[in-house]
Amino acid sequence: MQLKDLQAYEILEKRPIKDLNSEGIILRHKKSGARIAVISNDDDNKVFYIGFRTPPEDSTGVAHIIEHTVLCGSDKYPVKDPFVELVKGSLNTFLNAMTYPEKTIYPIASCNDKDFQNLMSVYMDAVFHPNIYKYQEIFQQEGWHYELESEDAPVTINGVVYNEMKGAFSSPDDVLSRQIMTSLFPDTTYANVSGGDPLHIPELTYEEYLDFHRRYYHPCNSYIYLYGDMDVAEKLAWMDEAYLGKYEAIGLDSEIKLQKPFEKPIEVTHKYSISSTESEENNTYLSYNTVIETALDEKLYLAFDILDYALVSAPGAPLKQALIDAGIGSEITGGYDSGTLQPTFSVIAKNTNPQEKEHFLAVIRETLEGLVKNGLNKKSLLAGINSSEFRYREADFGHFPKGLLYGIQCLDSWLYDDMRPFLHLEALDTYRFLKEQVETDYFEQLIQKYLLNNKHASVVIIEPEKGLNAKNEAALEKKLAEYKAGLSEDEIRKLIADTKHLKEYQETPSPKEDLEKIPMLARSDMKKEAAPFYNTELSVKGVPVVHHDIYSNGIIYLTMLFDIAHVPAEDIPYLGVLKAVLGYVDTKNYSYADFANEVNIHTGGISSTIGVYPSVKDKDDYQVKFEVRTKALYDKLPEAATLMKEMLFTSNIDDEKRLYEIIAELKSRLQVSISSAGHSVASTRAMTYFSKAAAYKDTITFYETLCDLEAHFDERKEALTAKLKEMVSSIFTKEHLLVSVTCEKDGLSIVETELEKFIPMLYETSGEEKQAEIVPVRKNEGFMDASQVLYVARAGNFRAHGFDYHGALRILKVIMEYDYLWINIRVKGGAYGCMNGYMKNGDTYFVSYRDPNLEKTNEIYDGIPAYIEQFTADERDMTKYIIGTISDMDVPMNPSTKGDRSMAAYLQNISYEEIQKERDQVIGATQEDIRGLRDMIASVLAENNLCVVGNEETLQASEGMFGEVKHLNESER
């Protein structure tokens, strides 16, 4: 069958998308009005999504709650959580759903055609025929509900989205971005919080929620996307027959309206909560925000991305530097948001004070006027363009399929113009245009028009308030107490019964016959062989080099790995400071701003990272490297190598002013990452109680070090510069160096030539070195911050108790994450997420994410061994868990990821036979293998290593669980 044979569809456009080496097709389903965009090519990582325009009219989070709930069972697949069943039992390379300010999308991806069809089928049924109309419990569980355990207990509110958004509203960055949207678009859907404001989520009724689904989840309001190597005609014929052909187009107005421009800029002040020990001084956020036309201007869409780099984001960018030099804020960021109908551009100063507002605005205006008059730095513009174009051509989105990112980008134009889904994907002509404009005043005129003369602008101030969370919680408790007091005895009994009923509903598993309706692959569909390693050893001037011979599309990925095991334990946090300094201070030939421009003009970037490689046999053995990475086109590698030498051997570490700026900015960034990634912070900290390797990844010690350095900089600066210089000369030596290269064979000679010039410049190793003495100490800490939720972590090491690693642990991870922990911590407990991990060196952790509970979650962890002991699974269930595990193991890799995986195996001394053995253990696993892990996990939990990050009041109330409870910012005081 061919596309032209499909009578149900009208082909609106079919043409090559040369920039992506693909064919683009735009179609409309005649009967239902559904829109379809196809990007057809030879990529076997196929992507599908169905999306809807979902403009909210309030901040109850209705669009977000629907996104969660349509994946809780449907007509054809009536299980309670088909999403989880698919995660456990499919070979998906991506599976999720996302709510944006005015759209909701349901994407899936898979390299297996049968699996891809299964996933499409479940998702199409979920959005069009969800069980939400049959079971109000789904709305209560995922959205919100009142809870009352007994007549004497207080009424509380729980729900997954409710708790997720309590976590989101704990972050000042999130609060600021929401206030910017509200300030600039007060009369449009963007003024509302599509994710839901916890204050307003409980205002949403079940009927209003169903009405929203009825209104917007119709094919005529849908956007269907297909990408990759597939029989497009077959997929479209199936969609027509199974779903779209059953609907008639209706008159539905979901158009996103433009905000009428302002007559003058407006100002908004809003509060956010800080903990009782944080200072209100230097904790305000100031932002200046403007609206930039519409997302349908492809030149402006990219030009402001470049201006973001040239003005604010690049090291030493003029607007950033002017504000820092004026003493306004410790971190200056730019925010160009092109994912809405009217893109916005923001300049944000973090960690400043409200009285600096006029000064902040004056510095912005003076700096921008100076740039318009005297011209922008041409190299800075070129660097921004080249960096953006390199990323576009490389299309490396980490573990996200590139087809998914292309599909999401389609909606930046498609949502507002049915005929232009590919507008922003065809970017090479725009890059050429922008390069030509560098020598003109094009960019300066954009500054004049959109940043200086633009009345459609706002100033948003986010001020800290101590104990605001506690005040809001007290107000909520009072409101709930009044609500309870207004209930009759019968109503109280009903609420207790409803609470009990919901728990019973959550505890009742889906019937086996329903579970069997979820389509699933067989064990025979799985690839038996593990992915190969690509390691060839050679030597250049006595330095070991490992070459990963992989097709890399003309790019060389080069990593210099310097051993740092000799760095004393007390100096480990300073490795993070060194990493932040290199490339961000002046060098012999460049200011740090010029250095950044040179890097971005000639390469895909130069970065540093700390790589930790635990032994797979010995829990106390590990390798740790200071890694300096670059990527460049073959003909640009000489420039990349020259810039690496410049950075490593001529950086000016004596510049105290610059050093202070870097430390203050780094501390500010770390604050944000602690609030957004508290699960990672807590689990790593818990592992430092017993694991030497974990000490190198401990965010909290690093954060405390930065707080101390910032607060006492004048006393510490001499010792700090001396320490950093000593580190440079002791780390960057020939004896410490190991080189990793990912490219085809024909690129290797280019690398060897550059290494021959690089190696003689390395420092000499002075004297004998011994490995750092790291002595883990069990502390069991609670770290209080201004969050409304918690991140609860338990950890231990099974090798310490004589147990060996087994492939079945990979399956246990899936079982825990999507059965035991999911049901108890997320479904019943209301947390947004839960994770667990089992390393080959024995390090093990369990952690919750945006969790309202502490003691209850800890008790759930204690129940894991009993769950494993009683674990039963028939052949179908075991196969499902195994498929989900293999899906995790077989995530498609780009060239750099293949190289990194091969290098990690080399450093950890993992043979191909060992990973094949692990894969065989996974594919051949039985329920007995899972039950056999009971004693291992019991031994880990018996260590009782507990670390919790989060809500101040909850941690204080549970102080007895910890050795110490303290504020995250304690070292600042």
Question: Which ranges hold each PLM region?
Answer:
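Non-catalytic terminal extensions that flank enzyme cores
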Residues: 1-47
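M16 family metallopeptidases and their MPP-like homologs
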Residues: 45-55, 81-129, 136-147, 174-199, ...
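Hydrophobic, small-residue-rich alpha-helical packing segments that form membrane-like cores
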Residues: 150-219, 225-243, 247-274, 280-282
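Active-site His/Glu-centered metal-binding helix of metallohydrolases
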Residues: 62, 66-70, 578
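Non-catalytic, conformational "gating/processing" segments within enzyme and secreted inhibitor domains
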Residues: 158, 210-242, 720-755, 942
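His/Glu-based metal-binding/catalytic segments typifying zinc-dependent metallopeptidases
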Residues: 40-42, 49, 162, 166, ...
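Generic recognition of flexible, low-complexity loop/linker segments
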Residues: 94, 210-214, 273-276, 319, ...
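Extended, regular secondary-structure scaffolds
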Residues: 211, 223, 232-251, 374, ...
